[in-house]
Amino acid sequence: QAASLPLALRGQDLIAQASTGSGKTAAFGLALLARLNPRRFAVQALVLCPTRELADQVATEVRRLARAEENIKVVTLCGGVPLRGQIASLEHGAHIVVGTPGRVMDHLERGSLTLEALNTLVLDEADRMLDMGFFDDIARLAGACPPIRQTLLFSATYPEGIARLAARFLRKP
């Protein structure tokens, strides 16, 4: 956390090997909040997580970190929850979206989510997302983001798939 935060705050792309419970959510949460414009009601940060449980934990932590700021809206998009409520939440304006690749992809395809204002993409537990077969969804989501953005990749392990992801989506990590 201490090593990644200064780089992340400078807007650099980052690959960090971090296990669960290492404080990485605080590190990337502070970094994405630093880049956020609360007066712009558009999705400016997207955090992809492998599971609904992790997405819920991350969203809770980011909301806690955002309490110091005025009116920052965090929306969680995961499967197993009705789409209708999620669409309504997005229509009311969201600054940060935390979710699983499949459900975030659903919203992108439906047009209920747009990413053109995005400045930070976080891949949390990227190795687990690859193990679960999400490479194509991650690739499509990253392709829908503006090319000029910060990408932060966190992974407990560093398999070949992570190297491929990093080579494709990160700039000078």
Where does each model-flagged region fall?
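Conserved pre-motif I regulatory segment
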Residues: 1-17
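Motif I (Walker A/P-loop) of helicase-class P-loop NTPases
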Residues: 5, 24-34, 59
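Walker A/P-loop
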Residues: 12-30
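Residues at the beta-strand->loop junction immediately N-terminal to the Walker
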Residues: 15-18, 48-49, 155
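Short glycine-rich anion-binding loops that position phosphate/pyrophosphate groups of nucleotides
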Residues: 21-22, 102-104, 127-128
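Conserved nucleic-acid-binding Ia/Ib motif block in the N-terminal RecA-like helicase ATPase lobe
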Residues: 40-109, 117-120, 163-167
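Post-DEXD/H (motif II) to motif III coupling segment of the RecA-like Helicase ATP-binding lobe
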Residues: 114-123, 127-173
